[in-house]
């Protein structure tokens, strides 16, 4: 064995002693990342997961879980507002969007706690921050609570998910929000223009309309929910119009 090879081996040993070394490092704690980490740990690997913000991913924190909780509240509000007589309900009822929002966060946080429990149960190291590759076997944490930490690994799984795609010339901020900002707001606006009549846009429209918000949906295609069957689009458009939602199809926006 040559001196250069011996030096490389010594260097690797020193790195493992002075830094945290793992069989598997997972970038991203969404459903792809944390499930992969659990499986690797079950197979006997030493595993770490690096996550900069949302343990459990977008779905659990600011996506399908809190949105479905809000939809349930909106469904209850709709029943009182539009179907009370059919259920034998009478009297004045008020609806507090802030309470609905608080419930949605509680539901979300409860499930996220479950993700942390699974990490602990499977002896997976949690690292909070943004991971950046220093080389093919090293990641440095450049942001977050564990900023400055360096880890080395034998294998890395990249499960970083995606980011919101904005419209050309549009910057998120102020009264222009993405789904993420909106789902974290604890107050309902007086009015809202929703660009896009896909599933996310239609869900927000239903929630807000049932809490008295003046909602307008702008859609480039010729119908709402354009990826669904035409019969579905037709029926849901009819129901939304009954709610007072304005639907503008075959339309563009200019800001």
Language-model-detected regions and their locations in the chain:
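Rossmann-like NAD(P)H-binding beta-loop-alpha module
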Residues: 187-220, 227-228
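N-terminal Rossmann-like FAD-binding beta1-loop-alpha1 element of flavoenzymes
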Residues: 24-48, 204-209
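Conserved small/polar residues in nucleotide/adenosyl-binding loops
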Residues: 253-255
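Beta1/beta-strand and adjacent pyrophosphate-binding region of the FAD-binding site
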Residues: 18-30, 190-195
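Glycine-rich flavin
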Residues: 20-22, 38-45, 50-188, 216, ...
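Conserved phosphate-binding and hydrolysis motifs of nucleotide-dependent enzymes
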Residues: 28-33, 161, 196-201
């Amino acid at each position: 064995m040559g001196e250069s090879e011996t030096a490389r081996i010594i260097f690797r040993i020193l790195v493992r002693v002075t830094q945290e070394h793992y069989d598997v490092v997972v970038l991203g704690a969404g459903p792809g990342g944390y499930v992969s980490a659990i499986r690797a740990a079950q197979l006997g690997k030493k595993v770490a997961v690096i996550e900069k913000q949302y343990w459990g991913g977008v779905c659990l924190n600011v996506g399908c879980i809190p949105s479905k909780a809000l939809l349930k509240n909106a469904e209850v509000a709709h029943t009182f507002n539009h179907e009370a007589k059919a259920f034998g309900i009478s009297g004045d009822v008020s609806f507090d969007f802030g309470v609905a929002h608080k419930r949605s966060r509680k539901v979300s946080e409860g499930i996220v706690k479950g993700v942390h429990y699974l990490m602990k149960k499977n002896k997976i190291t949690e690292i909070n921050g943004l991971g950046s590759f220093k080389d093919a076997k090293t990641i440095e944490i450049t942001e977050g609570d564990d900023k400055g930490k360096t880890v080395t690994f034998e294998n890395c799984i990249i499960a970083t998910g995606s980011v919101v795609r904005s419209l050309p010339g549009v910057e998120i901020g102020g009264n222009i929000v993405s789904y993420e900002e909106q789902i974290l707001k604890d107050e309902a606006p007086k009015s809202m223009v929703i660009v896009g009549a896909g599933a996310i846009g239609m869900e927000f429209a239903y929630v807000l309309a049932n809490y008295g918000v003046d909602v307008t949906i702008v859609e480039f295609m010729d119908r709402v929910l354009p990826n669904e069957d035409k019969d579905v689009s037709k029926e849901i458009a009819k129901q939304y119009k009954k709610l007072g939602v304005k639907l503008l199809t075959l339309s563009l926006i200019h800001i």
